[in-house]
Amino acid sequence: ALPIFKNNFNVEVLIPSEYKILKDTSTLFWATYNPDKEEVIKQLLVFSFIPKSANLQQEVLQKTDSILAQYLKGAKQEQYVKIESEFPPYYNNNIYKGIWKLEKGFMGGPLLAKTYFVGDKIIVSVGLVFDPNSRKRKHLKILEAIL
């Protein structure tokens, strides 16, 4: 595991070595776990923004939805990942727990997001799990530790 985020986001997070880093810029960090022999996909995304709204929780969810739709696409062009609006995420102590779904598709699973306040920015770290054949608790506990 390597500390990755200290330079770009001023938050130190350890990424397990089995994750593949897909993007590491000053605006977005994205890593994925997608082994060949398992039907498991885990995504980690970290981004930041300067809040402009009085409703901070809503703004965090909107920004997260926007990032998910931009980077996590399905097999078809019109498919993208979004936060499931039928079950709004539960929020407590800067942690959001909810469900994601593939728009115009048949995938979904748990979503976990943590927010950190650094100066005038909010840093959002998001983890998603897709594992249709098992319970997700173990995956979520690992994501919670990473984020």
Predicted features and spans:
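Short hydrophobic/aromatic-rich beta-strand segments that constitute the beta-sheet cores
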Residues: 21, 31, 98, 124-125
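Secondary-structure transition/turn motif
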Residues: 33-37, 101-102, 128-129
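Signature of long, low-cysteine stretches enriched in small and polar/charged residues
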Residues: 69-122, 134
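N-terminal helix-cap/turn-to-beta initiation motif at the start of protein domains
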Residues: 6-16
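Surface-exposed amphipathic alpha-helical segments
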Residues: 1, 13, 19, 123-147
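Secretory pathway targeting signatures of secreted, lumenal, and periplasmic proteins
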Residues: 16-69
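Charge-rich, low-complexity N-terminal segments
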Residues: 1-3, 35-36
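Short, surface-exposed beta-strand/loop "edge" segments at domain boundaries and coil↔beta transitions
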Residues: 38-41, 53-54, 104-108, 132-138
